[in-house]
Amino acid sequence: MNPADNILWGNIIKVHGVKGEVLVQVFSDDLTDYETLESVFVEIKQKQIPFFLSTFNFATQKRCILSFEDVTTVEQAKPLVGADIYIPVSKMAEADESRLSYQAIIGFEVMDTIQGKLGVISNFFQKTGQDLLMMDYQDAEILIPVTEEIVHSVDVKTKQVITTLPEGLIEIYLNEDASEPDAD
């Protein structure tokens, strides 16, 4: 399986119980769509390693308890804490595509309807007044307001965020970097 065909689904928060189970924070609104998963990919040393599931139990609306076939002790589970979990894009619930968390689209490419390919989403900020996506573009960090007029859609299969950025938005950030005084 090509890692590019997978999407970030969750993160292992901690070991749960004494049989090597793990508590997972899932970046999805409806876990019932995923209770039939047979396997997931756990990122270990920047590689996505397949883990087959023994059990999938609901903990809360956005958390589940997983047990893996070859992980049966706390000692085996501890090194997995903090690891990201990926699933194949093909396993992503259709309903979830419209409710993706910002965390899940980090690494997606920004495709603007006017300017074409721009950069990659590197972070997000959820603010009271305005959610923002951060895009890396020409060694600058561009903040993109998340509004219906600017961010049109997210294509999970191509890992693209489709936008129409306001005229001059990118230039504000590029000029800001160019106008910073040199430190002597």
UniProtKB/Swiss-Prot annotation:
GO MF annotation terms: ribosome binding
InterPro entries reported for this sequence: PRC_barrel-like_sf (IPR011033), PRC_RimM (IPR056792), RimM (IPR011961), RimM_N (IPR002676), RimM_N_sf (IPR036976), Transl_B-barrel_sf (IPR009000)
Keyword Transmembrane helix: no
Transmembrane segments: none
Domain PRC barrel, first and last residues per copy: 97-173
Keyword Methyltransferase: no
Disulfide bonds: none
Keywords: Chaperone, Cytoplasm, Ribosome biogenesis, rRNA processing
Any one of the GO BP annotations: ribosomal small subunit biogenesis
SUPFAM superfamilies, per database record: PRC-barrel domain (SSF50346), Translation proteins (SSF50447)
UniProt subcellular location: Cytoplasm
Pfam families, sorted: PRC_RimM, RimM
Primary localisation category: cytoplasm
Quaternary assembly: Binds ribosomal protein uS19.
Protein function: An accessory protein needed during the final step in the assembly of 30S ribosomal subunit, possibly for assembly of the head region. Essential for efficient processing of 16S rRNA. May be needed both before and after RbfA during the maturation of 16S rRNA. It has affinity for free ribosomal 30S subunits but not for 70S ribosomes.
UniProt record similarity statement: Belongs to the RimM family.
UniProt domain comment: The PRC barrel domain binds ribosomal protein uS19.
Protein known as: Ribosome maturation factor RimM
Organism of provenance: Cytophaga hutchinsonii (strain ATCC 33406 / DSM 1761 / CIP 103989 / NBRC 15051 / NCIMB 9469 / D465)
Gene that encodes it: rimM
